[in-house]
Amino acid sequence: MTIRAGAETFRGRWLVGCDGGRSTVRKAGGFEFVGTDSEFTGYSVEVEMADPDQLSVGRHYTPTGMYTYARPGTIAMVEFDGGAFHRLQPITLEHVQAVFRRVSGADVTLTALKLATTWTDRAYQATAYRKGRVLLAGDAAHIHSPLGGQGLNLGLGDAMNLGWKLASTIRGDAPAGLLDSYWSERHPVGAQVLDWSRAQVAIMRAARSSRALEAIMRDLIDTRDGATYFAERVWGVSLRYDLGGNHPLVGRSAPDFELVDGTRLGELIRNGKGLLLDFDVSAPLEALASRWGGRITYVASDANDRLGLSAVLVRPDGFVAWAGEATPDLEEAARAASRWFGEPDEALLSS
């Protein structure tokens, strides 16, 4: 395919659009982008004001929106039903002053605007992440409000999931359907984040029902289990792909095991290959890994806390493909290896 940008021309066999929420690749590729339009315009500003003592620090809900006053000069505010603010419009002191008075109801005079940015809760997602040799990742595939900071983890997760699968496809050693699993694994995660961002917007409304929902949320977050649940969901660490398998770790991000020599799992998966980590130093597992040649790295070492496992097979993106307890099931391990790294090398099988 050929991409022309001004006087430059780029050619490649594959194209991955990671070019943001207004993605040129997505539009040129004809990807359908569906979702919900914004209900508010958000502003994050640094200002100088004549009478800062009129404002109290903290989050404040009002009939027209909400604002957070963190320290003198720093304001974040959301205006519902105030009309869309076009991103190409200049953000002037007069505009920020008018919005702040509408939202806060406070007769505070802003005297200087140092920094300003706007954002919305527009939530859209591509109905497909791949068309032939063109793929989407990050904000090109999905957009949502920045509340909770979920977009960074979401986009990085796309890149980690896609990168090794595309590399395997280009090398020619990918098993059937590997690249399609990018869509089946990542699209539901994106949809879930969009729904969570919509739920956050519902709670921000001034309606009595929204305040009741917020009170329930606060009660839940005040508990250890509730706080853990919400933190894991927002940070993405509770994610589990449906990869089959009988162990609860399969489909989850692998724990960063520390081996007895101090090496950590994260250091062992930076080469883009699968990793078979054998805590029991088992000859049959070493032989199994060797059947995949250079596609799977075999490491035999105990760990300081192996979580009751005898061995674990980890994909290049850090997710567990297979986990064994006590006497490992070699057939199950081989099936997992074939699913993610292709069939074993016939020459190695016969040797």
Positions of the model-derived regions?
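Core Rossmann-like FAD-binding/catalytic domain of the broad FAD-dependent monooxygenase superfamily
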Residues: M1-E214, R218-I221, A347-S351
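Helical substrate-recognition/capping region of FAD-dependent monooxygenase/halogenase enzymes
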Residues: A98, R102, S168-S351
